[in-house]
Amino acid sequence: MLFRSDVPGFLPGTGQEYGGIIRHGAKMLYAYCEATVPKITVILRNAYGGAYIGMCNKELGADLVMAWPTAQIAVMGASGAVNIISSVKKEIKNAEDPDAVRAAAIEDYEEKFNNPYVVAGLGYVDDVIEPATTRQRIISALDMLSTKRESLPAKKHGNIPL
């Protein structure tokens, strides 16, 4: 399974909740976890929150996760994060130039938390790759994982969330 991930997140709202986004998302996550084939994820641009998890990350059992240098991987985007971090909110509110303080806070957040090198250092991404090498890196990964053998016990199955 090859995942090319660019997910800005789930669109929150009652329409999605009533439509069963959690239930349907759980079916997809269950399928990832039960799959015994090689699973490779390439994060192209954005990977935020629950939507990032839904694109087969390391915690879901991806064999290899690669990211482009421009990828942004975090719980949420920088502009949203600075709006909810209480110390930053106070600083912006009390500033003479709120726009400049907010822009500096966004830049600081992106540098500290929202880049693939930080995430790779924490072990959530295996490698940060150049976009031009993506095809060759995927081919190499598939070659490396061609002998992967993962089997589930006979007559054992999980409890799929229907």
Segments (PLM) and residue ranges:
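Ligand-binding clefts of soluble mixed alpha/beta catalytic domains
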Residues: 1-162
